[in-house]
Amino acid sequence: MRLSRFFMPILKENPKEAEIVSHRLMLRAGMIRQQSQGIYSWLPLGKRVLDKVNAIIRDEQNRAGAIELSMPTLQSAELWQESGRYDAYGKEMLRIKDRQDRPMLYGPTNEEMVTDIFRSSVKSYKDLPLNLYHIQLKFRDEIRPRFGTMRSREFMMKDAYSFDLTREAAEHSYNKMFAAYLRTFDRLGLRAIPMRADTGPIGGKLSHEFIILADTGESEVFCHKDFVDFDVPGEHTDFDSVEGLQAIFDKWTSLYAATSEMHDEAAFNAVPEGDRLSARGIEVGHIFYFGTKYSEPMGAKVQGPDGKEHFVHMGSYGIGPTRLVPAIIEASHDDNGIIWPASVAPFDIVVINMKAGDQACDDTCELIYAALSKAGKDVLYDDTDDRAGTKFATADLIGVPVQIIAGPRAVANGEVEVKDRKTGARETMTIEAAINRFVA
């Protein structure tokens, strides 16, 4: 992508409405624009990051055996009345009526709808276990939306819903998602700590929030410091192994970790003083096991091996991609801008032409741009006629992991400079060596 043809409306000044680093940098880098209170457009740079976040989420959901579907954003109020949540949910839910004056709602979550899909299609235990997920825009009318897309009214969620015959089987499905979430956040460059959490309006018997530690976090959290160094489940994790997944769950829940809502001061004080960690955190995922809370009132049941009908045991598992993007920025930035993990960076490499219009610089940059693009790299080519300082500031602000800088003096010697955005390390090398480093 040539920067001269890319839509990336950079802001030179810090926006006054931004309270936290991620909101400020997302606005300055031209990733998002606010359309109304708590509602944002995702501009091309931001959407590239969001798409890569979603790709990792999908990959890990598929690996764990979940199956993707798509459900509508508008839902019938009848389903929510059936579950008993229509009146209980409160003013966060946007209620509307269609032209026939039928009550509808803009879904804040999808337990009722997916249960309706299940009960109309699945009748036998032989079709279990089943885990269905989707990634969708949702709306909750927050009283005080703030921090950009960290806490907005319209937001994107990955929701998965598991269906099992027994509690034991449902707990295995829960453990699958538990391990999948650990892997997902690790691939996104985040260290997420699972903490026992309140079930809130979703309800249920078991719940964990996945929290990343950050000074700007809204929640106060308390945990054992060893969580920071725990090994995440590997790529070859067997998601069919009951014992293996239970061992992962047991390890990651063996030490004290709780949000402020579930905090037990006495239990925390039992942790050796040098091992206690009190901090602020950002919730990036939430999983629930709620048994038959929805299946019983909505009649979601299957015939078991005993020939009798059984209400299915359910779980739900949420990750907010539009919340994850600012969370990643909160965890990885410096005074100059964003430092993206390679897995979600909008571009892999930015090629900076220090003197656009200079034939040697132009030819060198075109050569590098073409070679890296052909090799499958996402490359941003800064071919603008901006001053060198502006180009460097832009590259640092948007956080592309690698900068390849071509200036007249270096190019005259057949060389370019390669800069690592995270470490700031610079290395001069031949043009061929620079290409080969990222093509090989």
Curated annotation (Swiss-Prot):
GO terms for cellular component: cytosol. It catalyses: tRNA(Pro) + L-proline + ATP = L-prolyl-tRNA(Pro) + AMP + diphosphate. The gene is proS. GO terms for molecular function: ATP binding; proline-tRNA ligase activity. It comes from the Bacteria. It is an enzyme of class 6 (ligase). Belongs to the class-II aminoacyl-tRNA synthetase family. ProS type 2 subfamily. The keyword Protein biosynthesis applies. Keywords: Aminoacyl-tRNA synthetase, ATP-binding, Cytoplasm, Ligase, Nucleotide-binding, Protein biosynthesis. The lineage of its organism: Bacteria, Pseudomonadati, Pseudomonadota, Alphaproteobacteria, Hyphomicrobiales. GO terms for biological process: prolyl-tRNA aminoacylation. It is found in: Cytoplasm. This is Proline--tRNA ligase. NCBIfam families: PRK12325.1, proS_fam_II.
